[in-house]
Amino acid sequence: MKVIKTAPLIPSEIKVLEKEGNRVKISLAPFEFGYAVTLAHPIRRLLLLSSVGYAPIGLKIEGVHHEFDSLRGVTEDVSLFIMNLKNIRFIAKALVGQDSSLENQSVVVDYSFKGSMELRARDLNSDHIEIVNPEMPLATINEDAQLNFSLIIYKGMGYVPSETTRELMPEGYMPLDGSFTPIKKVVYEIENVLVEGDPNYEKIIFDIETDGQIDPYKAFLSAVKVMSKQLGVFGERPIANTEYSGDYAQRDDAKDLSAKIESMNLSARCFNCLDKIGIKYVGELVLMSEEELKGVKNMGKKSYDEIAEKLNDLGYPVGTELSPEQRESLKKRLEKLEDKGGND
């Protein structure tokens, strides 16, 4: 008998269809029609963005001062050595199982190799480090040569450019880009499934592959947990107390947008670039589109990236879409600040 529902069906089945090495296929069902893709896409994105891995972000080589140096007695130059190093996937044993909410989790490891040898990733295994792709080549050391180097390995997620890791480096270390994500591939398919003879239900099949730093099924569960926490905040806060008032200036973070750009601690180059076109307040940057910001005279890539990172830290990524009411309210607030000649 047909019924008119007042609540969606809750999925009750999760099955591991295949598991081989670092790859797993997982099935979740049943979902109401249209629900499967609604949930599958953000889970896929979170797997790619929030999965935690390990990467070297600092390198110190004895006798080397920058990445364009040569390595005495080593076939590869420093640039190629770094490229090979980035292809090696590490597990920092001391950091496994530590609370991921803790920031700047790292280990430092020292290596010394002497004499003729084909140095491979497996040679970096130690009491502190496990290599998951041991056959990757690293360097060719000639007879009577010695290679001494140290690595700083961090636990993290996503991709972190060397411009950011530079701030974490002790003296003498070269900063490296950090590619932390352990996810090599994640795709999903949506299939129809019968529920009590009704074919209008759906099933999600995830196909997940990692690089070996993390078990793919554990990575999936972790992504779902992140998603649950992200959405859970809406259930924890009283909606009545955060209802939109129609005046953007009433938001708690409106003060951030009325702050002068000096508060962003920009480099002199960035500050001068904005100052020359009359940008005084953070809110003026938030109102600019990505194209407008990139089109500012003398706005190079490094300056743009620096501003974008600062805005992202404030919770307003470049190109943030504000409602017409929010834009109008913010513009009025900035006009008042201009009239007063400073923050109110």
UniProtKB/Swiss-Prot annotation:
What the record says about family reads: Belongs to the RNA polymerase alpha chain family.
Task: Write the protein's name.
Answer: DNA-directed RNA polymerase subunit alpha
Q: What is known of its domains?
A: The N-terminal domain is essential for RNAP assembly and basal transcription, whereas the C-terminal domain is involved in interaction with transcriptional regulators and with upstream promoter elements.
Region Alpha C-terminal domain (alpha-CTD): list its residue ranges.
253-344
EC number(s): the record gives: 2.7.7.6
User: Pfam families this protein is in?
Assistant: RNA_pol_A_bac (PF01000), RNA_pol_A_CTD (PF03118), RNA_pol_L (PF01193)
Q: Which reaction does it catalyse?
A: RNA(n) + a ribonucleoside 5'-triphosphate = RNA(n+1) + diphosphate
Q: List the InterPro entries.
A: DNA-dir_RNA_pol_insert, DNA-dir_RNA_pol_RpoA/D/Rpb3, DNA-dir_RpoA, RBP11-like, RNAP_asu_C, RNApol_insert_sf
Q: Which GO terms describe its cellular component?
A: cytoplasm; DNA-directed RNA polymerase complex
Among the GO biological process terms of this entry, one is: DNA-templated transcription
Main EC class the enzyme belongs to: transferase
Q: Which organism is it from?
A: Helicobacter pylori (strain HPAG1)
Among Gene3D superfamilies, the record links this protein to: 5' to 3' exonuclease, C-terminal subdomain, DNA-directed RNA polymerase, insert domain, RNA polymerase, RBP11-like subunit
Keywords (alphabetical) are: DNA-directed RNA polymerase, Nucleotidyltransferase, Transcription, Transferase
Signal peptide from the UniProt entry: none
Stretches the record annotates as Alpha N-terminal domain (alpha-NTD):
1-238
